[in-house]
Design a protein with these regions (language model features):
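Short gly/ser/thr-rich secondary-structure transition/capping motifs
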Residues: 12-17, 48-49, 113, 150-153
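Glycine-rich beta-strand-centered segment in the early N-terminal region that forms part
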Residues: 21-38, 50-98, 129, 134-137
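Conserved hydrophobic/aromatic positions in well-ordered beta-strands
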Residues: 4-7, 68, 123
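Cytochrome P450 core scaffold surrounding the K-helix E-X-X-R motif
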Residues: 42-47
Length: 174
């Protein structure tokens, strides 16, 4: 498959478009044909040398596409389904995860940062991170959702501690 990778840190000139091996999904993963991957500021930080990134590296934390293959243990997703990928990985077992603050998990990572991202043709994603997208969103719109949604969600449910029934003001909605 084709992918955009970096082999060194720097400006846009370090981006290379090249052939890389197709990913092989595990039994608990799905293989996604990436149709859109949006640019997040995290991609720029990683490209410029964010600590903890192994090279070569594929950027891209926000992606959407369609499932082409499902692993043996995956029962709720199907080939052909249009999906986006929640870019956060966490253990889902520690006290922080159980409390709903997965972004504080010691095993917390972000796709496109600690692991290769979605600036590629095919991406193997854990089924628990895959979310079907409604027909009302195209792939470009869906790819703009993942990381910004998670950031907003954690601020609203964590810092602001909003609860069902409370009234909130949403600025900038359309």
């Amino acid at each position: 498959m084709k992918a955009v990778r970096i082999h060194q840190f720097g400006g846009p000139e370090v981006l290379t478009y090249e052939d890389v091996p197709d990913p092989k999904p595990r039994k608990d993963q799905v293989l996604i044909r990436v149709r859109a991957c949006s640019l997040n500021h995290l991609d720029i930080w990683v490209r410029k040398g964010l600590p903890g990134v192994n090279l070569p590296h594929i950027l891209g934390s926000d992606m959407a596409g369609e499932i082409v293959e499902v692993g043996e243990y995956v029962t709720d997703l199907k080939p052909g389904q249009r999906v986006l990928v929640a870019p956060m990985h966490f253990c889902n077992r520690c006290a922080k995860c159980v409390a709903g603050v997965q972004n504080q998990c010691r095993q917390f990572t972000v796709i496109g940062n600690a692991v290769d991202g979605g600036n590629c043709e095919l991406f193997a994603a854990a089924a628990v991170n895959v979310i079907p997208i409604p027909k009302s969103l195209d792939f470009n719109e869906a790819a703009s959702v993942p990381l910004v949604f998670v950031t907003a969600w954690h601020m609203l449910t964590g810092r602001a501690a909003i609860r069902p029934g409370q009234t909130v003001l949403v600025l900038g909605a359309n």
